[in-house]
Amino acid sequence: MPIVQQGAINTTALIVPDLYVQIVPPQVLLLNGVPTDIIGMVGTASWGPVGEPTIVGNMSDYAANFGPVMPRKYDMGTQVATAVQQGAGNFVCVRVTDGTDTAASLTVLGGVTFTAIYTGSLGNQLSIIFSAGSAASTWRVTIAMPGQTPEVFNNIAGTGAAFWSNLADAVNNGNGPLRGQSQLVVATDLSADTNPIAGIFSFTSGTPGSDGVGTITAASLVGVDTLPRLGMYALRAQGCSLGLLADADDPTQWSTQTAFGLSESIYMILTGPAGDNIANAITVKAEAGVDSYAAKLMFGDWIYWSDQVNAI
């Protein structure tokens, strides 16, 4: 009974009946790790897509996608900022509104209407700058907003209605291999027979945008589980390990959050009201039926936090 290493003999050439043992060396197995540091955040914001999970790594990412921290209840930025200061750096953020959010818009010289690509009050800080283009008899149009890289559309030619048509086409589709479509606004050509003039046109003189937060509740943050999913349910299949609904202190929504955590293997962080006491917290928790490894109910007064963005 020969014992050999695997591959040392040609088994197809063996002609003598016998028992042959081959030693098979151990194989190297590659194990892919599963991240456990992804935090799902749901709350309100002044800019950005609604109901669309967006990856954020730090506060610069957050500001670029959702605008600044806002000093109000249910604000998503406040939750992200406090988590970042404690070392977190991997978020999936979902913006919610009450359905009344609107996008800022501005009509320039009767020739074109610019509308912010997202709803929210941050769009009110947009500005459009007209100046001479690099080529003769052309115009350069710059779209700027605080916290965003200015978008420059150069060498837009034409006069009268032709210019406004060319401008709208450049903004909506790009005007070169290095200048794609705008990520801040969309343009609507009004076919006006007017010519552009140099200057700065601010959205503060147009139709203001709104955040849609006037009637937000904890139920709004929970959202709906039908397509397109909104609120908490937009975190499905996003790989989150932790989940937090900003300031969702309504105990009638805790069991729903817990059930979602169980279904998605997410550890849900539940929020109690500010200024709560032990006796009330125990009673409310029992009435809500929260008793699961998939949820943690935070007790205690809400923290005092130095908001350096709003200086409060």
Positions of the model-derived regions?
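A glycine- and small-residue-enriched flexible loop/hinge signal that marks low-structured segments
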Residues: M1-I312
